[in-house]
Curated annotation (Swiss-Prot):
One cellular component term from this protein's GO annotations in UniProt: cytosol
Keywords: Cytokinin biosynthesis, Hydrolase
Signal sequence annotation: none
UniProt organism field: Pseudomonas aeruginosa (strain ATCC 15692 / DSM 22644 / CIP 104116 / JCM 14847 / LMG 12228 / 1C / PRS 101 / PAO1)
Native organism taxonomy: Bacteria, Pseudomonadati, Pseudomonadota, Gammaproteobacteria, Pseudomonadales
Protein name according to UniProt: Cytokinin riboside 5'-monophosphate phosphoribohydrolase
Length: 195
């Protein structure tokens, strides 16, 4: 799969450890070095601002999508290649998904998880065939991955759908995995045969 743009979901907070910001810098820089456009939530704060600043500093193109309410709160990044202001969170997610060829989640909070799970669900439902992945940073997503495996074991998620979520220990490894990903064909829902 040829990637031209990658949407990054990440926190509006820098997190408790400097390793999170270091990972955001590495990802932003690597996206720019590969000539990939960064699409993200448009914020100037937390990991959002860090990944955008790193991509811009490395000569990359950065497109931010921000809801009007957050723009009015003055957290929108003013130095982006392009900042689009939309009506609300639903429009933001839809526009980011429209512009992106792939999705990566850095560490973040509820908004990051919600964005990741929404695009993952869209992929499961066949609304898109775009790869998504987690950048492994300091074991941040390990508890979530364990829970996701539990969902498969309990037959609430198909293994094929669980397998849609790639992971990488470095930006290079993750971007290579996303570029090599091919969608698997699987029934939408878990087998409903009684046990």
């Amino acid at each position: 799969m040829t990637l031209r743009s990658v949407c990054v979901f990440c926190g509006a907070s820098p997190g408790a450890s400097p390793v999170y910001q270091e990972a955001a810098v590495a990802l932003g820089r690597h996206l720019a070095e590969r000539g990939l456009t960064l699409v993200y939530g448009g914020g100037a704060v937390g990991l959002m601002g860090t990944v955008a600043d790193a991509a811009l500093a490395a000569g990359g193109e950065v497109i931010g999508i921000i809801p009007q309410s957050l723009q009015e709160a003055e957290i929108g990044h003013k130095g982006l290649t392009r900042l689009e202001v939309v009506d609300g969170m639903h429009a933001r997610k839809a526009r980011m998904a429209e512009l992106a060829d792939a999705f990566i989640a850095l560490p973040g909070g509820l908004g990051t998880l919600e964005e990741l799970f929404e695009v993952w669900t869209w992929g499961q439902l066949g609304y898109h065939a775009k790869p998504l992945g987690l950048l492994e940073v300091n074991g941040f997503y390990d508890p979530l991955l364990t829970f996701l495996d539990h969902l498969v074991d309990e037959r609430f998620v198909r293994a094929e759908h669980r397998g849609m979520l790639q992971r990488g220990a470095s930006p290079e490894a993750l971007l290579d995995a996303l570029a090599a990903w091919t969608p698997s064909v699987a029934p939408k829902w878990v087998d409903r045969t009684p046990q």
